[in-house]
Regions:
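Active-site loop immediately N-terminal to the catalytic Tyr-X3-Lys motif
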Residues: 56-62, 121, 139
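C-terminal helical subdomain
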Residues: 90, 109-140, 144, 151-153
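Active-site helix of classical SDR
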Residues: 30, 67, 75
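Substrate-binding pocket helix/loop in short-chain dehydrogenase/reductase
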Residues: 3-19, 110, 114
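Alpha-helical segment proximal to the catalytic Tyr-Lys
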Residues: 35, 79-84, 142
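Short C-terminal tail/terminal secondary-structure segment
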Residues: 56, 134, 145-170
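Residue(s) in the substrate-gating loop at a strand-loop-helix junction
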Residues: 51
Length: 170
């Protein structure tokens, strides 16, 4: 993750650190993991953890969103380059409730209001992401590579829906 930062005033150092942590580090790790798997003669799997921030606008988080978007592209590219021996899959997390995220989402009332914008009416929890990773690591997903599993409870309600009356009573 990354703390919120206004894109007009975030420092170059901050921006680079967010991109290094969320894009460069996973790429370097993937290269090292691939080498270790190939050197041992093993097929393998690399699971990247991305964020819905890489799939939509991310106010106060442009560097984080850009890095996660880049990670999604890297997943597809590495799968193409390294297949069939190495599979590469992304698991993209929606709004996940953790101790750290509470500082970003606010108090319990704010969390409840945010949850109402999600079709499943709750924020995800770390186990939701872990379960998706377990599926990706299982034999049931052996033909999956270069893809992105989005775990977001159905997404977030588009903001214009709060302003329209077109769907009242639906």
């Amino acid at each position: 993750g990354a703390p919120p930062a206004d894109s007009s005033s975030a420092s170059e150092r901050f921006t680079k650190s967010v991109i290094d942590l969320n894009l460069v580090a996973p790429l370097v790790f993937s290269q090292l993991a691939r080498k270790a798997m190939v050197d041992k003669g093993n097929d393998g799997l690399i699971i990247n953890i991305s964020s819905v921030s890489g799939m939509r606008a991310n106010p106060m988080g442009v560097a984080y969103g850009a890095a996660k978007s880049g990670l999604l592209n890297a997943t597809e590219t590495l799968a193409l380059e390294w297949g069939p021996q190495i599979r590469v899959v992304s698991v993209t997390a929606g709004l996940i409730l953790t101790e750290d995220s509470r500082a970003f989402y606010g108090d319990d009332e704010s969390v409840s209001q945010i949850a109402e914008t999600i079709p499943m009416r709750r924020l995800g929890n770390p186990e939701d992401i872990a379960n998706a990773c377990l599926f990706v690591a299982s034999e049931a997903s052996s033909w999956m590579t270069g893809t992105n599993i989005v775990v977001h409870g159905g997404g977030e309600k588009p903001s214009y829906l709060s302003a329209t009356t077109a769907f009242e009573g639906s």
